[in-house]
UniProtKB/Swiss-Prot annotation:
Keywords: Chaperone, Cytoplasm, GTP-binding, Nickel insertion, Nucleotide-binding
Assigned protein family: Belongs to the SIMIBI class G3E GTPase family. UreG subfamily.
Gene responsible for this protein: ureG
Residues making up the signal peptide according to the UniProt record: none
A Gene Ontology biological process term: urea catabolic process
Function: Facilitates the functional incorporation of the urease nickel metallocenter. This process requires GTP hydrolysis, probably effectuated by UreG.
PANTHER family named among the record's database cross-references: UREASE ACCESSORY PROTEIN G
Annotated Pfam families: cobW
The organism of origin for this protein: Lysinibacillus sphaericus (strain C3-41)
Source lineage: Bacteria, Bacillati, Bacillota, Bacilli, Bacillales
Binding site for GTP: G10, P11, V12, G13, S14, G15, K16, T17
Gene Ontology CC annotations of this record: cytoplasm
The protein's name in its UniProt record: Urease accessory protein UreG
Length: 209
């Protein structure tokens, strides 16, 4: 069985790398995990995870995409597929590969060929009206994570209003309010991955892989 591939997308500074860090800290104790990060000109996110995270360096690959980060996760994902191939050859028993995109806008989505599902991260500091702006990533991602809730009172954001807007824009798709840095509700993200990606994703891989 192939490892389940989970995309982590979102604008620059929304907390993607912090989320990957927290998820790997929790999940590496029970699952065989690896990570691919996408940066335009550097491997900074990969280096952060190597330096500060819990995974061995050989389980983390940094991809330098150049140009538009959107292209590397959708139109031409060849560099990411090469990294996946590398990791699956290194580790025959991988359960999960997290693929973090470079920072992009609300229209950035992952190719369904590249990932089995993806989490899109926004943060409250982007403004209370961010959910109303829509965009495919915000409305159609498998899970929307609204991060940095602790900043809400400092940036004039009413989380109740934001919740109503998110609910309307998501049309029944799941979303979670969280504060990743303080680990608030990271457990809910883990539960979502376990129930909606590892179980359903494994079934999909078995059917198509």
């Amino acid at each position: 069985m192939k490892p389940i591939r989970i995309g982590i997308g979102g604008p620059v500074g929304s907390g993607k790398t912090s989320l990957v860090d927290q998820l790997t800290r929790v999940m590496h104790e029970h699952y065989h995990v690896a990570v691919i990060t996408n940066d335009i000109y550097t491997r900074e996110d990969a280096q952060y995870l190597i330096t500060n995270g819990v995974l061995a360096e050989e389980r983390i690959i940094g991809v330098e995409t150049g140009g538009c980060p959107h292209t590397a996760i959708r139109e031409d994902a060849s560099m990411n597929f090469a990294a996946i191939d590398d990791l699956t050859k290194r580790f025959k028993n991988l359960d999960i590969i997290f693929i973090e995109s470079g920072g992009d806008n609300l229209s950035a989505t992952f190719s369904p060929e590249l990932v089995h599902g993806y989490i899109y991260v926004i943060d409250v500091a982007e403004g209370q009206d961010i959910p109303r702006k829509g965009g495919p990533a915000l409305t159609r991602s498998d899970l929307l994570l609204i991060n940095k809730t602790s900043l809400a009172p400092h940036v004039g954001v009413d989380l109740d209003i934001m919740d109503q807007d998110v609910k309307k824009m998501r049309g029944g798709r799941p979303y979670i309010f969280a504060d990743v840095r303080s680990q608030t509700n990271v457990d809910k993200v883990v539960e979502w991955i376990q129930h909606h990606m590892l179980l359903e994703g494994a079934e999909a891989v078995d059917n198509h892989g």
